[in-house]
Amino acid sequence: MANHETIFDQLKKQIPVDEEEPLILNRDSSVGLVIVDVVNGFCTIGSGNMAPTKHNEQISKMVEESAKLAREFCDRKWPVLAFIDSHHPDIPERPYPPHCIIGTEESELVPALKWLESEDCATLRRKDCINGFVGSMESDGSNVFVDWVKEKQIKVIVVVGICTDICVFDFVATALSARNHGVLSPVEDVVVYSRGCATFDLPLHVAKDIKGAQAHPQELMHHVGLYMAKGRGAQVVSKISFET
């Protein structure tokens, strides 16, 4: 019998992402939700250089799960922080092509999350770099994200968004380092909700025809992003439930 196991299947066996038990949240959880870059420029078909060119199931599911989770949090008046990728046209973010330029529709929340703009529980933070922690820094040395954590007394941070292996991972890794360094009190845990994350797809055969592009197979890089986040100390879960 032929062996139809793919290289990806073999990789998952070598670097498995052993997910934690389902995360159960209640009014005593002291939890905050961080949504990373769920904007048109990464999620809405045809909305720029980094957006999908056709329906993408992983990205669509991520948007759906992120919106659902945000609604659950806001209904309970729990804090939500949404990072919004926003770049100046004269400051490129290499190696990526121009994307999410300030003042364009690319740099706006997707329609499914646009309602967050009028929610009292939501803090929106535009950032001009991959790492939301760094993008939260102000010229006076303060940090919007750190201040949000301290003001809301957040012990558990739940993270969703795009891209799993880039902006999500960079933020998670830095938040964990800050926690370990004692500058993110009272945070105890950072939880990555796998079904609420996604990354972009650039297969090798397509990347070969784009000067300077690196191949970025979606399923593989999503898995690697989750694996790396767990290796840094994050909890990775595929199910979140709420106690009444």
Curated annotation (Swiss-Prot):
GO BP field: pyridine nucleotide salvage; response to abscisic acid
CDD domains: cysteine_hydrolases
EC number: 3.5.1.19
Annotated tissue distribution: Expressed in roots and stems, and at lower levels in flowers, siliques and leaves.
Keywords: Hydrolase, Pyridine nucleotide biosynthesis
Pfam families: Isochorismatase (PF00857)
pH dependence: Optimum pH is 6.5-7.0.
Reaction equations catalysed: nicotinamide + H2O = nicotinate + NH4(+)
Involved pathway(s): Cofactor biosynthesis; nicotinate biosynthesis; nicotinate from nicotinamide: step 1/1
Knocked-out gene: effects: No visible phenotype under normal growth conditions, but mutant plants have decreased endogenous levels of NAD and NADP and display abnormal hypersensitivity to exogenous treatment with abscisic acid (ABA) and sodium chloride (NaCl).
GO molecular function, one term: nicotinamidase activity
Family that this chain belongs to: Belongs to the isochorismatase family.
Its biological purpose: Catalyzes the deamidation of nicotinamide, an early step in the NAD(+) salvage pathway. Prevents the accumulation of intracellular nicotinamide, a known inhibitor of poly(ADP-ribose) polymerases (PARP enzymes).
Protein name, entry field: Nicotinamidase 1
Gene: NIC1
